[in-house]
Structures are given as C-alpha cells and as structure tokens.
C-alpha cells in the first residue's frame, strides 16, 4: 500500500464521518498493535502534493489540477501527529470521537509507512511501541 493510497483511505474515512481528525491504529500480522497515529486534516493540499512529487513526476495537467484544488480548498492538508508519552496519548485520543482501525497490515508495510511519515513531516513521528 503506497503512502498516497493510505492517506486517501484515511481522508475518505474522515470525510465520511465528518471528522477533522482520525486515529489510525496499525497492527502486525499476529494482531498486536504496533503504531497509533493521529492524522489531522486541515484546508490545503501541500503535503499530499509533496508526497506525490516524491513518488513520481507530475504532468502539467496534474499540476493545474493541484493549483485549482489549492484555490478551492477541496483537498485537505495532512498533519501527522503522534503523542510522545503514554499519558498524553490517552488525553490525545479522548479529543477525537471516531477511530478507524486499519488492521492486519504487514510489519513491512508498517515500517514503510512509518519511514515515509518521518521523511515527509517536519516533526518526528513517535510510535507507541517498538517493532
């Protein structure tokens, strides 16, 4: 699963449930929770564009679509946030009322997502437990 598809899935869930933030829990094949991320959607398309630019070059038509999307604010900007401590994790989780669980992802997929999140965000992504 590419990071862009992953983002699209989460945004779809956030939009469907009319939430600005969504908690995603990632699991290894044996069912143990490996990572909990909060993905916050606000108005802009910058990070999604950055992620897509890192994967493949964009054609002129796609760039025009992105500029139009930025003007209309149709597409959300993704801000990844993970609490640094277990205490703050509980407080943080209480802020949001809807959770989406994308379970049974392979550990390789999880590592790939985690590494790409780190490389694409300014603030570090902290997981709740080690691999």
Curated annotation (Swiss-Prot):
Keyword Glycoprotein on entry: yes
Subcellular location(s) per record: Secreted; Host nucleus
Record comment regarding domains: Has the canonical translocation RxLR motif, but lacks the canonical EER motif, which characterizes most oomycete effectors identified so far.
GO cellular component: extracellular region; host cell nucleus
Similarity section: Belongs to the RxLR effector family.
Record's function text: Secreted effector that completely suppresses the host cell death induced by cell death-inducing proteins.
Name of the molecule in the record: Secreted RxLR effector protein 45
Keywords assigned by UniProt, alphabetized: Glycoprotein, Host nucleus, Secreted, Signal, Virulence
